[in-house]
């Protein structure tokens, strides 16, 4: 009788294969359970009475996007509200916006009216008050998060 083909060895080989399959399936299940339940980098909350959203990002999302900010100011030559041109975001209808940063990791889109562009500075006839923190780098990503659009 061939020792490899004995019923006892076949049973043992079958048990070993079954054990490997069971352990492999259990390992896959553990990987799926280890994934975070809510891994969203951004949480949206409606701003009551508007069509706007308050966007709260995780610390990791802020770092990954590389958000940078500046403050609105009053232009000393014109007396007009001014903001870095890099803060201005144009939507698909041509309307102009900035994202304000009212508190750490929180961003809210606000409409602005650009009167004119002077180099790297946008002079505004309407917008957030002087001293308001606005996003200068990463506004497009915030817009994408707000409207759930892929980049």
Predicted ranges, named:
Residues 3-16:
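Bacterial N-terminal signal peptides that target proteins for export
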